[in-house]
Amino acid sequence: MLRFGTVMVAAMLLATGAARGHEAEPPPKKETPAVPIKFSETRRGRVLADSRGMTLYYFDRDDTGNKSTCDGKCTEKWIPLVAADDAKALGDYTVIVRSDKSRMWAYRYRPLYTSHDDTAPGDTNGLDPENLWHIARPAN
């Protein structure tokens, strides 16, 4: 009878796969968002914002041909929205390579920046008196 019970337990283990030695599959990897840009409501209306909620801006002197002209001292006030090495374009969001070989995000081929003057999510203090910097807004 003991032998019959042992055979039955072994058969049940085989039937359920428990005796195969398989471990549970690891949980799926958490994927980081493909594009670290979201929409945010501010006192100036709906804007594009980075993952922290900081308003994004674009520069009139950047042409829309995948080039940033804000280098050197300019980046002390206007911080490029950095793209990871493995970042991929998605829809209206593209990745451009800067003159220093770093990568940054662009929206509709316009490079995106945050402003040093914005200190909290939703701030829109980055507009300049020369009207060269503009708040980036989602397309309608």
Feature locations, PLM:
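Compact beta-sheet-dominated domain cores in extracellular/mature segments
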Residues: 3, 20-140
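Bacterial N-terminal signal peptides
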Residues: 5-16
